[in-house]
Design a protein with these regions (language model features):
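Short amphipathic alpha-helix that is part of the acyltransferase structural core
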Residues: 1-49
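A generic local structural motif
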Residues: 23-26, 63-66, 96-99
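Extended, folded domain segments that form the structural surfaces/walls around functional sites
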Residues: 80-81, 111
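Conserved GNAT acetyl-CoA-binding A-motif
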Residues: 102-115
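Conserved active-site alpha-helix within GNAT-family acetyltransferase domains
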Residues: 115-139
Length: 147
């Protein structure tokens, strides 16, 4: 298994859930220059990946001021972190995050989650809960990693 910078974004997007694809693919050209992607590859198959944004990502446009505040503090946004279904529960999300932290040492990251059951996963990986806000009545929790 290898951790690689993404060169095949469309290949990565194909492993994402349909609703995630619908939120990134149509606007990708607007974010490509300010976003890096990283993948876990096993036997020439993308098994996990995620995007690192240096400007407000498409799924956070409703909270653009919040995004700007984090970017102004030197944080990068992690989004679209995904492990394919058949490889779940093998610690690959943690492997992806560990490799990212090694690839970009001393970098601060922030992210949001809607699935609050992911709290334990992110805390286990060194992230700290900061606050919550609501988007269309749905709670989103903000987490940071301070490198």
């Amino acid at each position: 298994m290898t951790f690689e910078a993404c060169t095949d974004y469309l290949g990565f997007f194909k492993i994402l859930p349909k609703d995630w694809q619908e939120s990134i693919v149509p606007v990708w050209k607007n974010f490509k220059a300010s976003t890096s992607g990283y993948l876990l590859i096993d036997n020439n198959q993308i098994i996990a990946g995620g995007l690192v944004f240096s400007k407000c990502p498409p799924d956070m446009l409703y909270a653009e001021n919040e995004s700007k505040a984090w970017f102004n503090k030197g944080f990068l946004y992690l989004g679209f972190i995904y492990v394919i279904e058949e490889k779940r529960h093998q610690n690959l999300g943690s492997v992806w995050l560990d490799n990212l932290k090694k690839r970009i040492p001393n970098q601060k990251f922030w992210l949001t989650i809607e699935d609050l059951k992911l709290d334990a996963f992110y805390v286990k990986n060194g992230f700290k809960y900061v606050k919550s806000f609501y988007n269309d009545g749905i709670e989103e929790a903000v987490y940071t990693f301070e490198g």
